[in-house]
């Protein structure tokens, strides 16, 4: 049970959050608990959705974004986000079980994606303090400056969702995947 009350329906959410939750429902077909939880703060929900939707139009493929989410969620010990991104990774990004395991371990079986995931892991663990060599390795794998910045933003976005879900102990509404690590 969540430590912060989660509106059970869109109509239970604050008035300013309702159109945002309706948009989530149109996009996903359902409104996952995390979105309903965050709707307690309409400005937080608006900010999250703005960044989420902007990044979805970026240069990184959806599969790479899901790989990063899995790696960061494992680092931060967020079972809610691991559950959500395992589900989304399989259903939307078509990631298989060996790939998801590799992502949770901070790697990828795809050579180019591996560079992005490893860079994201360094960013998350070192709180942004990456070496010149680590940035060069990312670029050598074919990533642009814009994509490097997007990777930073995905790490930040996923860290935020990890923190909010761990703080609130959001009830998991996906097939449950337990984090191996606790932050």
Question: Which residues does each PLM region occupy?
Answer:
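Hydrophobic alpha-helical segments
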Residues: 1-183
């Amino acid at each position: 049970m969540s430590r912060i009350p989660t509106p059970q329906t869109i109509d239970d959410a604050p008035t300013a959050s309702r159109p945002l939750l309706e948009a989530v429902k149109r996009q996903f077909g359902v409104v996952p608990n995390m979105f309903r939880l965050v709707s307690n703060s309409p400005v937080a929900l608006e900010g999250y959705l703005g960044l989420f939707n902007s990044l979805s139009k970026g240069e990184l493929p959806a599969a790479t974004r899901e790989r990063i989410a899995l790696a960061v969620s494992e680092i931060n010990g967020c079972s809610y986000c691991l559950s959500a991104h395992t589900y989304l990774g399989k259903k939307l990004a078509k990631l298989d079980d060996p790939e998801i395991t590799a992502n949770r371990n901070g790697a990828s079986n795809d050579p180019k994606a591996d560079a992005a995931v490893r860079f994201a892991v360094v960013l998350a663990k070192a709180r942004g303090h990456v070496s010149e060599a680590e940035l060069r390795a990312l670029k050598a794998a074919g990533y642009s400056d814009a994509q490097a910045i997007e990777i930073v933003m995905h790490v930040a976005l996923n860290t935020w969702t990890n923190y909010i879900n761990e703080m609130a102990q959001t009830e998991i509404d996906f097939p449950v995947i337990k984090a191996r690590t606790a932050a």
